[in-house]
Amino acid sequence: MKAILQVINLVLISVVVIIIPPCGAALGRRKA
Protein backbone atom coordinates (compact mmCIF):
# COMPACT_ATOMS: atom_id res chain seq x y z
CA MET A 1 0.00 0.00 0.00
CA LYS A 2 2.75 2.46 0.95
CA ALA A 3 4.59 1.78 -2.29
CA ILE A 4 1.39 2.38 -4.28
CA LEU A 5 0.74 5.62 -2.40
CA GLN A 6 4.30 6.77 -3.09
CA VAL A 7 3.87 6.06 -6.81
CA ILE A 8 0.55 7.94 -6.85
CA ASN A 9 2.15 10.87 -5.03
CA LEU A 10 5.04 10.96 -7.52
CA VAL A 11 2.60 10.91 -10.44
CA LEU A 12 0.46 13.66 -8.90
CA ILE A 13 3.52 15.81 -8.21
CA SER A 14 4.84 15.34 -11.75
CA VAL A 15 1.44 16.21 -13.23
CA VAL A 16 1.15 19.28 -11.00
CA VAL A 17 4.67 20.42 -11.89
CA ILE A 18 3.92 20.00 -15.60
CA ILE A 19 0.39 21.47 -15.66
CA ILE A 20 0.32 24.10 -12.90
CA PRO A 21 3.03 26.57 -14.06
CA PRO A 22 1.11 27.78 -17.19
CA CYS A 23 -2.22 27.78 -15.30
CA GLY A 24 -0.64 29.53 -12.32
CA ALA A 25 0.89 32.15 -14.61
CA ALA A 26 -2.47 32.70 -16.33
CA LEU A 27 -4.30 32.94 -12.99
CA GLY A 28 -1.62 35.28 -11.64
CA ARG A 29 -2.01 37.52 -14.68
CA ARG A 30 -5.80 37.52 -14.33
CA LYS A 31 -5.63 38.35 -10.61
CA ALA A 32 -2.97 41.01 -11.22
Swiss-Prot record:
GO biological process: amino acid biosynthetic process; branched-chain amino acid biosynthetic process
Superkingdom, taxonomy of origin: Bacteria
InterPro entries xrefs: IlvGEDA_leader
Keywords from the named record: Amino-acid biosynthesis, Branched-chain amino acid biosynthesis, Leader peptide
Pfam families registered for this protein in UniProt: IlvGEDA_leader
Signal peptide: none
Name of the protein in question: ilv operon leader peptide
Species whose genome carries this gene: Yersinia pestis
Gene symbol of the encoding locus: ilvL
